[in-house]
Amino acid sequence: MKKRRSKKERQELLQQTIESNPFITDEDLAEKFQVSIQTVRLDRMELSIPELRERIKHVATKQHEEDVKSLPLEEVVGEIIDIELDRHAISIFEVKIEHVFKRNQIARGHHLFAQANSLAVAVIDEELALTAKSTIRYIRPVKLGERVVAKARVEDVENDKGRTVVKVRSFVGEELVFTGTFEMYRSSNYSEEGNNL
């Protein structure tokens, strides 16, 4: 039988765990440390560690507003937590009651698509980026309360069609739930007459 950690020891480990993974939930912390969710919340309060939503907002700093050129951050579905233009980006989307079917609490597919598509637009290093074509696959239903982490990677900039290819993979925990390949037009390919579209 495992010896219970002291409060001080548990709080030190809790702080280290949150520093290494700021997106961990109170529920996951409670399970990890074999204590109640209320104990985790009290420990966080004593250590002045904000709740998950505030930690996510803190990570999605003002810097990202300056980084993203192709659309305002408020138009991105989910919160961008990491981005390097024309390379990769990550966003987090919390599935809430307004995102699910009432009957079965499963997220409507267009929300997962919108998260992936808006991330594919945001990662493009141009003032104008439009989706020309997408190939998507839903792997498993996402449910109310789950957190979807979308990871976009730019695979091919200015390919033979003059488009940029962005691949997006979305996860709940470690489980892949959605994939998408997006062919993007960029403003460098756009003419006033629309000839390049």
From Swiss-Prot:
It comes from the Bacteria. GO terms for biological process: fatty acid biosynthetic process; negative regulation of DNA-templated transcription; negative regulation of fatty acid biosynthetic process. SUPFAM superfamilies: Thioesterase/thiol ester dehydrase-isomerase, Winged helix' DNA-binding domain. The gene is fapR. Belongs to the FapR family. Keywords: DNA-binding, Fatty acid biosynthesis, Fatty acid metabolism, Lipid biosynthesis, Lipid metabolism, Repressor, Transcription, Transcription regulation. The keyword Transcription applies. HAMAP family: Transcrip_fact_FapR. Transcriptional factor involved in regulation of membrane lipid biosynthesis by repressing genes involved in fatty acid and phospholipid metabolism. This is Transcription factor FapR. The keyword Transcription regulation applies. Gene3D superfamilies: Hotdog Thioesterase, Winged helix-like DNA-binding domain superfamily/Winged helix DNA-binding domain. One of its GO terms (molecular function) is DNA binding. Signal peptide: none annotated. InterPro entries: HotDog_dom_sf (IPR029069), Thioestr_dom (IPR006683), Transcription_factor_FapR (IPR017275), WH-like_DNA-bd_sf (IPR036388), WH_DNA-bd_sf (IPR036390). It holds the Pfam family 4HBT.
